[in-house]
Amino acid sequence: MDPYQASKETEKICRLAPVIPVLVVHESGIAKPLAEALISGGLPVLEVTLRTQSALKVISEMAKVPGGVVGAGTITKSIDVKDAINAGANFAVSPGSTDDILETCAQQNLPILPGAATSTEIMRLFDLGYSVQKFFPAEAI
């Protein structure tokens, strides 16, 4: 998937909900009911950060809930991309945008919401073809 197509797919995902909850879930047992509650409340797009040991299991459980679109957040290495796909993630979110992560997502046909914090990073991603980006961290630098 080229950057243009990745951005088109990511844009479609982003348009499904007014906000995308960023979830840090420590217990996989609550994953399915949490996803069901969020989806029934009008938030079908869920980002599960890869910051806990249970994150991949959480993605796997949430991906089973009808009507949900589950992404893996805090992607920092190419192996994270592969693990996220194996867990059932529909998209990836990265806090930064290394060539390795972008190339792996492209090779694996996984839409990515690449992170950028500076104007240089944003311009570089635009030059590569990524028109949909995550401003991260969303605070004063």
What are these regions (language model features)?
Residues 54, 79, 85-141:
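Conserved anion-binding
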Residues 1-91, 107:
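Conserved N-terminal beta1-alpha1 strand-loop-helix module at the mouth
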